[in-house]
From Swiss-Prot:
Catalytic activity line of the entry: adenosine(37) in tRNA1(Val) + S-adenosyl-L-methionine = N(6)-methyladenosine(37) in tRNA1(Val) + S-adenosyl-L-homocysteine + H(+)
Protein name according to UniProt: tRNA1(Val) (adenine(37)-N6)-methyltransferase
CDD domains: AdoMet_MTases
Organism for this UniProt entry: Musicola paradisiaca (strain Ech703)
Highest taxon in the source lineage: Bacteria
One protein family per Pfam: MTS
Example GO BP: tRNA processing
Cellular component terms (Gene Ontology): cytoplasm
C-alpha cells in the first residue's frame, strides 16, 4: 500500500493524523501543539538527510517524512528506552518505515559516532532548568535541561550539520532570549523566527527558530495565531497543519 493510500484507524491510545497514528502512552511527553508546530513549520528545501533530536514518539520525524513524501532519510534519536521503543513501533506502523530510523542513543554520543551529515536538524528540546521534580524520571528528562543542556545540544548539532544546513527548534517564549544569546556566542546565526500565540488576546507563548552556521541577511520574523477571536483555528494555522489534522 502506498503512502497516499494509507488511512490510519481511529484509536484511543494515541493521536490519529490523516496518514499515520502516534501511540504515546509510553512516552513522557505526549503529542502536543509544540511538536505539531515544529513538524509542520520546519522549512524544507532540497534536503538530503534529516535528524530529529529527542524524537519522543517520532511525531516530528513522521511529519517530516510525510512532507518529503518518503524521499529523504530521517534519523530519529531518543535517549529514553521506553520512548524509543514506542517511536520505532510508530514508525513501523507508518507508510515511512523504510525512511525513518529510530536510534536509542544520547545525542552527544551519537553526534560523535554517526558517519552522516544533515541538511536539516530539528528538536523540541528540554527547556527548563532543574526545578520541582515531575511525576516520573522520564518526564523530568524530557522537560529539564539537566538531561541535555542547550549548550550540549548546540555543540552536538554543530558537529553533524552541513555548512549550509539549518537547525530548527521550538521553545517557550520566556527562554528564547537566553537561548539565542547562547547560540550567538557559539557562532550560530538566526535565520527565521515565528512568535506563536494561542489567540489575539493572549501573549506569545512559543517561538519557532531556524538557526544557521553562516550569517543570513535579512532575518525573517513573523507571527502566528493558533486560534482567532471566535476560538476557531486561524487561517494561517489551518494552512500550516491541514495536511495532518483529521478535522481539517
Amino acid at each position: 500500500m502506498s503512502a497516499r493510500q494509507h488511512t490510519p484507524d481511529l484509536r484511543a491510545d494515541g493521536f490519529t493524523f490523516k496518514r499515520f497514528f502516534i501511540a504515546h502512552d509510553r512516552c513522557a511527553m505526549k503529542v502536543g501543539t509544540d511538536g505539531i508546530l515544529l513538524g509542520a513549520w520546519a522549512p524544507l528545501r532540497h534536503e538530503s538527510r534529516i535528524l530529529d533530536v529527542g524524537c519522543g514518539s517520532a511525531l516530528i520525524s513522521l511529519m517530516l517524512a510525510q512532507r518529503c513524501e518518503g524521499r529523504v532519510p530521517v534519523d530519529a534519536v531518543e535517549l529514553d528506552i521506553a520512548a524509543s521503543v514506542q517511536a520505532a513501533e510508530n514508525v513501523a506502523a507508518s507508510p515511512w518505515r523504510d525512511t525513518v530510523v529510530v536510534h536509542q542513543a544520547d545525542i552527544v554520543e551519537f553526534s560523535c559516532t554517526t558517519p552522516h551529515r544533515y541538511s536539516l536538524v530539528v528538536s523540541n528540546p528540554p527547556y527548563f532548568a532543574a526545578g520541582v521534580a515531575c511525576a516520573s524520571p522520564q518526564r523530568t528528562q524530557a522537560r529539564y535541561t539537566s538531561s541535555l543542556s542547550h549548550e550540549a545540544l548546540l555543540h552536538s548539532v554543530s558537529a553533524v550539520l552541513m555548512p549550509e544546513g539549518r537547525f530548527c527548534v521550538v521553545l517557550p517564549s520566556q527562554i528564547v532570549g537566553d537561548f539565542l544569546f547562547l547560540a550567538e556566542s557559539l557562532q550560530w546565526h538566526l535565520a527565521l523566527r515565528v512568535d506563536v500565540a494561542d489567540n489575539p488576546r493572549r501573549p506569545v507563548h512559543r517561538v519557532l527558530l531556524a538557526l544557521t552556521q553562516a550569517p543570513i541577511d535579512p532575518v525573517y520574523s513573523s507571527a502566528l495565531l493558533i486560534r482567532d477571536e471566535l476560538q476557531q483555528y486561524s487561517p494561517d494555522y489551518r494552512a500550516l497543519t491541514q495536511d495532518f489534522y483529521l478535522s481539517m
